[in-house]
């Protein structure tokens, strides 16, 4: 049996019980206490651009329809019929004004309102037997959008999304706000790996240390302008709000010179200068750092890199990828990976950038193959009895007395928010695991049961207890998510 208190205490001092990367009890706790109340990325507005467009996304075992209703509002609806629980939408994406349950034919508008109930009067006695008026598919308890990125939380009392993101918004803008019209996404590609979901999130958050070993061959074949993987140590790791990542150190030059070095054409540079704040521009132009990989707690990551795309050419071209580490079990993860690009970029640029993404971080990408080999091995090894005796050292960057090996950069040295250091460390991985431990330490309040189609007062009377809320009632559904009466 897992001693959860001991696990949490060890993680809080930077020592990592190896078995947390393949432990069924830990995973059950994660499902309840972490994924049951965190903000989780599910889609981007560009995936549902028109009224009626939808995609279906999963949060662990829960399926949600992310739709744009007829008024243009984004909805996140639990994909479960109010009658007998059948999924009302079985396609991954499409366009529909209504969703019809294939079991008994109940139908719902794309804003969630029930509009069709066969034999309502004959079978239920009309409204007296089943109150159809005002009933909706269950909306996600909390929904928030930032730069077109759609997040949901299963916690109705979740803090506002932008408060949760905090200063990490500063860095998210580099990936998602390169022009006034934002980005568009292609994908997602999906694949499964026999690895624990936390490993990928940690790797993208701040592990520059693995690059010279794991990815040496990719760098030394000449895919990048930087001739040696060891150059990663000249970049920084930063942590801000609930996310963190890494940067590359760029050669000397002006803002424009440095953005051209990364491969951005002048018209895109012009749009960046219009959209990014002076502080964001200074990180690149004055300080000489460009964002690379990053992770937002708990399971969302970003990648920004600039390989050579065309054979025989010295020119590089940047790509951006967004991905989600979707847990399947304690030892399996579904990776969802999107290609992201400035909506206003030329079609030629989009095509070459997509090629760069597939080459490096698509399902068959060179970096992906290197990384997955490590992650699968770690997960397998963590399952054994010997792993339960081992506390892995996650304290890189700290002396034994807790003092920093390298102090954070000052405001004169670095223009961005958060805590930023040059060189190898595990500060960011610790920050992720500290938040992980904090969630696992705090119990989740049980959610109220929802009664479908009957008066809450009557439900309480029948049950002989307090009245329970009904689906669509103000007690359980945020006002912003409630549908109008049919």
Functional labels for PLM-detected ranges:
Residues 43-50, 131-133, 363, 377-380:
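Short linear motifs in intrinsically disordered
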Residues 37-49, 122-127, 295-308:
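Short Pro/Gly-enriched beta-strand edge/turn motifs at strand-loop
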Residues 1-12:
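N-terminal flexible segment immediately upstream of the FAD-binding catalytic core
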Residues 9, 16, 20-60, 64:
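Non-catalytic accessory segments flanking enzyme active sites
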Residues 35-39, 86, 209:
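Generic structural signal for secondary-structure transition and capping sites
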